[in-house]
């Protein structure tokens, strides 16, 4: 789309200030949600406590569908954090996009492949870390890359690379495409007369609602695949 972003150079490395801002905003929102929803907890949950407990149970279900709770319980907080972080990040760029001096400052951080691929690398790195920690290096390496047959080793390496790419690029592609279409619709509305523009708002709102659905689905898929990959690394039966 030919967008430009504010950058700052530090030690010869360029940092995207828009990404830094939006990731920080996402973290603050998720933290506030967690704090607000866990204050004044009661035995009989209502309202906000119901919401956070529903998220906890939802992630628990994702984990239980991939590994036993004794093994997967330690990843419960990771799953909750990923689900909430990615969902909030996906939503930030939907209502509007802010550009100052032709530089985009406000948009979904997950609409940048650098952010999503970094997140994917971090997640896959954690699966290797816990695999080695829980199974031992030798057992982990042999069980992961030489099972069930040794000649599959090259394919297993390709699979690791492909998993990282698909995990990151799937999230990026869906969120970026949604923002592009919303931008196109908004641009077209700006050039229409008032009567046609009012009618055109309807499909714009429908697409915005669909984008919210896609953002939620992508947060779920990313969290689900994280637990799938984690189960493959930490469970002996895989």
From Swiss-Prot:
It holds the Pfam family ATP-synt_A. GO terms for biological process: proton motive force-driven plasma membrane ATP synthesis. Keywords: ATP synthesis, Cell membrane, CF(0), Hydrogen ion transport, Ion transport, Membrane, Transmembrane, Transmembrane helix, Transport. GO terms for cellular component: plasma membrane; proton-transporting ATP synthase complex. GO terms for molecular function: proton-transporting ATP synthase activity, rotational mechanism. PROSITE patterns: ATPASE_A. It comes from the Bacteria. It is a multi-pass membrane protein. CDD domains: ATP-synt_Fo_a_6. It is found in: Cell membrane. The chain crosses the membrane at residues 17-37, 80-100, 112-132, 194-214. F-type ATPases have 2 components, CF(1) - the catalytic core - and CF(0) - the membrane proton channel. CF(1) has five subunits: alpha(3), beta(3), gamma(1), delta(1), epsilon(1). CF(0) has three main subunits: a(1), b(2) and c(9-12). The alpha and beta chains form an alternating ring which encloses part of the gamma chain. CF(1) is attached to CF(0) by a central stalk formed by the gamma and epsilon chains, while a peripheral stalk is formed by the delta and b chains. HAMAP family: ATP_synth_a_bact (MF_01393). Belongs to the ATPase A chain family. NCBIfam families: ATP_synt_6_or_A (TIGR01131), PRK05815.1-4 (NF004479). Key component of the proton channel; it plays a direct role in the translocation of protons across the membrane. This is ATP synthase subunit a. It comes from Listeria welshimeri serovar 6b (strain ATCC 35897 / DSM 20650 / CCUG 15529 / CIP 8149 / NCTC 11857 / SLCC 5334 / V8). The gene is atpB.
